[in-house]
Amino acid sequence: NGAYTSFLGPQPLYLLVVVFLTSLGTWGLPQMVGKFYAIKSESSIQKGTIISTLFAIVVAGGCYFLGGFGRLFATPEQVAANGFDSIIPSMLSGLPDILIAIVLVLVLSASMSTLSSLVLTSSSTLTLDFIAPLKKKNMTEKSKLSVMRIFIAFFIAVSAVIAIVQAKSKVTFIAQLMGISWGALAGAFLAPFLYGLYWKKASKASVVASFVFGVGIMIVQLMISLGFITVSGGFLGLIFKNSLYSGVFAMLGSLVIVPVVSLLSKKTVPVNTDAMFSCYDRTVEVHATTALSDKKN
């Protein structure tokens, strides 16, 4: 069926969906914004671009070859019985103990760094942008810190519960779980982040619409994955085929919804938008070592 002879495999559309979800979806993850706050100068951007590109090549190339050579470690019968997620453990079982330990440490470090950035971003957003404005009295820094710690513990507990429930449910495909989480986050945040940075006409109503659309699509997908709702055939059948398809649809749909709703709700555009964008018009003098180009005449 072309699985071993075609460069794109027997399902090129599915491959395209995975590429969209893992590349375009990264733009819309809220925790990624925090990483840009740590940029020291424009010269750091230049170095980071080279390092991240090389890292992306290693990761993408490694994943591609893992998929290509995975068939050597698992037969179709084993995959049918244990699922695709059993291929990587089968490959690791043949490695020496020291290499298995290194792989486990790398996986745990990546998982913990993602979890920490997510819970920190979520707890600070809820505390500073939602709870603090609702308080009649100004919250002290100590009380804000206490509330953030409570949210951090709560989100970690929720993550543990989800992991336990997932281990005992029929939704065991890791990529589909990633599709639900990334689809909800990127579907909600991607368009507001992108248009908010470069387009003055982005409105508050469009941001709300993007949030409702992205999260709503993935909630429906979650209900379908858990078996509470059934969808088959036609356009809806394609969108909700699995969480990867619906995640990409949520992201691409939000890119259309935000400009359309913004043009229909011009009254909800913040009044100080011009003042916000004026920072791009001001002249800034910096040392040559911090400029984008470090070339000396």
Stretches with model-predicted labels:
Residues 1-297:
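Membrane-embedded helix-loop-helix hairpins and adjacent transmembrane boundary segments
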